[in-house]
Amino acid sequence: MSEDTVPEAASPPPSQGQHYFDRFSEDDPEYLRLRNRAADLRQDFNLMEQKKRVTMILQSPSFREELEGLIQEQMKKGNNSSNIWALRQIADFMASTSHAVFPASSMNFSMMTPINDLHTADSLNLAKGERLMRCKISSVYRLLDLYGWAQLSDTYVTLRVSKEQDHFLISPKGVSCSEVTASSLIKVNILGEVVEKGSSCFPVDTTGFSLHSAIYAARPDVRCAIHLHTPATAAVSAMKCGLLPVSHNALLVGDMAYYDFNGEMEQEADRINLQKCLGPTCKILVLRNHGMVALGDTVEEAFYKVFHLQAACEVQVSALSSAGGTENLILLEQEKHRPHEVGSVQWAGSTFGPMQKSRLGEHEFEALMRMLDNLGYRTGYTYRHPFVQEKTKHKSEVEIPATVTAFVFEEDGVPVPALRQHAQKQQKEKTRWLNTPNTYLRVNVADEVQRNMGSPRPKTTWMKADEVEKSSSGMPIRIENPNQFVPLYTDPQEVLDMRNKIREQNRQDIKSAGPQSQLLASVIAEKSRSPSTESQLASKGDADTKDELEETVPNPFSQLTDQELEEYKKEVERKKLEQEQEGEKDAATEEPGSPVKSTPASPVQSPTRAGTKSPAVSPSKASEDAKKTEVSEANTEPEPEKPEGVVVNGKEEEPCVEEVLSKGPGQMTTNADTDGDSYKDKTESVTSGPLSPEGSPSKSPSKKKKKFRTPSFLKKSKKKEKVES
């Protein structure tokens, strides 16, 4: 070692708070157990802890949804690579190994093929409701396999997809009941020809389907048929006595038909004999020395019949083997031992049943579907009756009285902001009236009597249903579900299309009366039953009658006869002549006053008549005008005198007051005479003109617009002045 290289002093290690072994006490039993554990066990526990995180991720529903979304995206792009296939296998594995809602059965299955293997791309070409039908039929095949009723051949379950096209679903030949899936089913027509091939490459058993096609042709009401030939059913079909009413299950089966089946239904005579034996209402067909076929309007009903049929056959076979013959058996009488109807229990003369009607065997079938889902079969069944009932509130918020506290607990959080609290309050107000125990009705009450029309004006108020006098029978319905009145089995896409159509009409401001009822098209309702409709119609009718009274003036001569009209015309002419004579007498008695006396008088009170806008009309010219005009106005009053500064039709009066006063008494009298003559000519032309059909003289088109009429009190004062003078 050289002299230059001198070892440096080692720095002390950093101070640590606590060592690993200092954390445990040597006397701790848990520490001693971990220390004495073998190394391989310790390594296994570490690996399990690492795998636990991976299992949690794989079993999370969010990861599975994200994976399915990724698969659908790649499928839309059309990339059918091996990566997509691997992702789909992972998704199926995750769904099959996920935790069930209920505890799993004691039966141990390492891996099973899911029933609902239809993906989004596969279900686009299916008919309406066909996806659910495929899942139901595949589930029935799995149930037959689980109960041990499946045979290697001729055990077929068929379902009618559509009555219009006569398409049916059947499993392919060579596929066992435990392998049938929704996508592997084949769609065929009534002749057994393939319409839509499934995911498998196996053909259709036309010989086995011939029996089903003959049944469907003979019974159009049947939608599902299950062919069963277990040892018990085959043994009962070989007995001459047939199925005996030994047990309660035999009574639940119902009527049965017996047919000698030779294995084929190719000839027309065999189909006719089958139709005669089957009848219009029978749901069980016994094939002699072969087996039985259960029919049903639905899949649930057909499986219900098969289940009780198999149980009845097993009971009968066991009873006959132990009793030694039919004479030692006690048979049930159909009249005394009646089976209970579906969904009802009769006791003490009353019937108790569910509020919601259910199909035959629906509850039992849903229970079996829940069992398959818990086992991991992924049935894809749509449940109508949920297993866990939602907790209902015993007291509504309306029934609970309002309470206020003036203090805040220390453990309470930060107070809710005002805006957020206001939004929550609005949301509660929207749902408060839907959850209220009280029922309110909109009622129109007569408020007051209108002054002109005299009809009561309705006033809209809200009253409790108990206080309102019901005009029609019925009971109020409490809305518990926003989709309470939506019909069942409706297509959501049709609802969305209709909503978009209505919104488009609102944007374009297109208003119509809405869809018209074909049933009520010819019915004419005398009176609307809706109070709001009555109030709207009443107010609208009052407004219409008021407008008509204001716009149209009644004709006073509409209800007079021709004779009365003639008398009225004569009376009008007589009054005209009297007025003319009085006017002539007044003109003759008038005397021209001195200019000194007439100066202080106003122009209206002067004896001179203001010149009219139109020139004086001669008698000849007046007669010509009367001939030209068909109707003239019956106006016998003298021409009105104009005050000073009056403007008529935008023009000043031609003769001024100063000019009239400057002319003198002689000219004033001559003007008055000429005015009287022209006035007389006018009255003659008026009286000589024809009358209108209403009996009143019409206005002449040649006559100018009227000027200001002299008030009556001024005329009286003028006469008084003349008498005084």
UniProtKB/Swiss-Prot annotation:
Subcellular location(s): the record lists:
Cytoplasm, Cytoskeleton; Cell membrane
Q: Where is the composition biased (Basic residues)?
A: 701-725
Keyword Cell membrane found: yes
* Segments of skewed composition (Polar residues): 596-621
Q: What is its main location?
A: cytoplasm
One of the entry's Gene Ontology molecular-function terms is: spectrin binding
User: Keyword set for this entry?
Assistant: Actin-binding, Calmodulin-binding, Cell membrane, Cytoplasm, Cytoskeleton, Membrane, Phosphoprotein
**Where does the record place the modification Phosphothreonine?**
55, 533, 612, 674
Tissue specificity is: Found in liver, kidney, spleen, heart and brain.
Q: Which Gene3D superfamilies match?
A: Class II aldolase/adducin N-terminal domain
Q: Where is this region: Interaction with calmodulin?
A: 425-444, 703-720
Q: Which residues carry this modification: Phosphoserine?
A: 11, 25, 60, 344, 530, 532, 535, 594, 598, 602, 606, 614, 618, 620, 678, 685, 688, 692, 696, 698, 700, 702, 712
Region Disordered, annotated ranges: 1-22, 525-725
What ranges does the record list as Low complexity composition bias?
687-700
- Provide the topology term for how it sits in the membrane: Peripheral membrane protein
InterPro entries assigned:
Aldolase-II_Adducin_sf (IPR051017), Aldolase_II/adducin_N (IPR001303), Aldolase_II/adducin_N_sf (IPR036409)
Q: Which residue ranges have biased composition labelled Basic and acidic residues?
A: 566-588, 622-631, 639-654
Q: Which cellular component terms (GO) are annotated to the entry?
A: cytoplasmic vesicle; cytoskeleton; F-actin capping protein complex; glutamatergic synapse; membrane; plasma membrane; plasma membrane raft; postsynapse
Q: Kindly name one Pfam family recorded for this protein.
A: Aldolase_II
Q: Which family does it belong to?
A: Belongs to the aldolase class II family. Adducin subfamily.
Subunit comment:
Heterodimer of an alpha and a beta subunit. Found in a complex with ADD2, DMTN and SLC2A1. Interacts with SLC2A1.
Described purpose of this protein according to its UniProt entry:
Membrane-cytoskeleton-associated protein that promotes the assembly of the spectrin-actin network. Binds to the erythrocyte membrane receptor SLC2A1/GLUT1 and may therefore provide a link between the spectrin cytoskeleton to the plasma membrane. Binds to calmodulin. Calmodulin binds preferentially to the beta subunit.
Domain remarks: Each subunit is comprised of three regions: a NH2-terminal protease-resistant globular head region, a short connecting subdomain, and a protease-sensitive tail region.
From the Swiss-Prot or TrEMBL record, give the protein name: Beta-adducin
Q: Which organism is it from?
A: Rattus norvegicus (Rat)
Q: Which gene encodes it?
A: Add2
